[in-house]
A protein has these predicted regions:
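Feature marks short, highly hydrophobic, charge-poor N-terminal signal-anchor/signal peptide-like helices
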Residues: 1-12
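Charged, low-complexity intrinsically disordered regions
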Residues: 40-268
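Acidic, low-complexity intrinsically disordered regions
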Residues: 1, 20-23, 57, 174
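Transmembrane-cytosolic junction motif
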Residues: 19-44
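Core hydrophobic alpha-helical transmembrane segments of single-pass membrane proteins
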Residues: 12-20
Length: 268
């Protein structure tokens, strides 16, 4: 028996070496991807006259208003599947015209059947003058449930999703109410749900120009788009794409300009 094990030892050594080589190759590729991504975001920040933040600073301005990576970390099932704590990654600050902007990534590793998978999101934040708290969300029509049956018009996704209905922390803190804004039946009401603590003020702000712009930018804006505590922000899945993120930033700024919103100072 000892001789058998001795004869098999070289084979086991080769197998172990192959496994080690595979892990090293994956690690090397991940490092190359990380470095390439960091370089691309740094080049974007430099081109905008901005800067990439140190890891200690890389936290969303709005983190206390909406927890980053909430879809992946909220609830018992999500917590049990987390292979690492949530972390904040590549984040850049810059000015776009008059506006102070922060774009930052967050991530969490989740356990899957064959190892781990990293989930990412990035958040776009703009500092603005104080506004009535508001959320604007696209309504998603169609689709099917887990049993393949069509979703009805009263399904939560067709009403803008759950997050848009959730009372913001600043409104809840003062015992405020959270209302859906009633718009006349038409293309805008079909595509968007808007909730706020001040429906009258929001209805006045949604001029025909604003409504037309929102319809034109329906897929260019993050959804939901939050207005709260001097910040306008939205979150999208996946990492920052340096080739496309400015289009989303400019879509938000275009909306603020049409609403007559003034720039604000970012939180310290």
């Amino acid at each position: 028996m000892v001789n058998v094990w001795l004869e098999l030892a070289p084979l086991f050594a080769i197998i172990a070496a192959l496994f080690g080589l595979g892990f090293w190759w994956q690690w090397r590729n991940r490092r190359k991807e990380e470095n390439a991504h960091a370089d691309a975001v740094a080049a974007l920040a430099t081109g905008l006259g901005g800067r990439v933040l140190d890891p200690a600073e890389a936290r969303p301005w709005s983190a206390e208003l909406l927890e980053p990576m909430r879809e992946e970390t909220d609830g018992l099932v999500n917590r049990l599947s987390m292979a690492s704590p949530r972390s904040f990654g590549t984040t850049l600050d810059f000015h776009r015209g008059r506006w102070a902007v922060r774009v930052g990534e967050a991530s969490v590793e989740k356990s899957v059947q064959n190892g781990t998978r990293t989930e990412y999101e990035h958040r776009i934040e703009v500092a603005s003058a104080p506004l009535p708290p508001m959320k604007i969300s696209r309504r998603v029509h169609g689709g099917t449930n887990l049993f393949g049956r069509p979703l009805g018009p009263d399904h939560v996704s067709a009403q803008g999703g759950e997050l848009v209905r959730e009372i913001p922390v600043t409104v809840a803190a003062v015992g405020g109410q959270w209302h859906r804004v009633a718009f006349p039946p038409g293309p805008f009401d079909t595509q968007f749900a808007v909730f706020t603590s001040d429906p009258a003020a929001v209805a006045r702000a949604f001029t025909p120009e604003v409504v037309e712009y929102l319809l034109a930018q329906a897929h260019g804006l993050p959804s939901p788009l939050h207005f709260e505590a001097g910040l306008v922000f939205g979150t999208r899945r996946d990492r920052i794409n340096p080739d496309h993120v400015l289009a989303a930033v400019d879509a938000i700024l275009g909306l603020l300009d049409r609403m007559g919103v003034a720039p604000g100072h970012p939180p310290r």
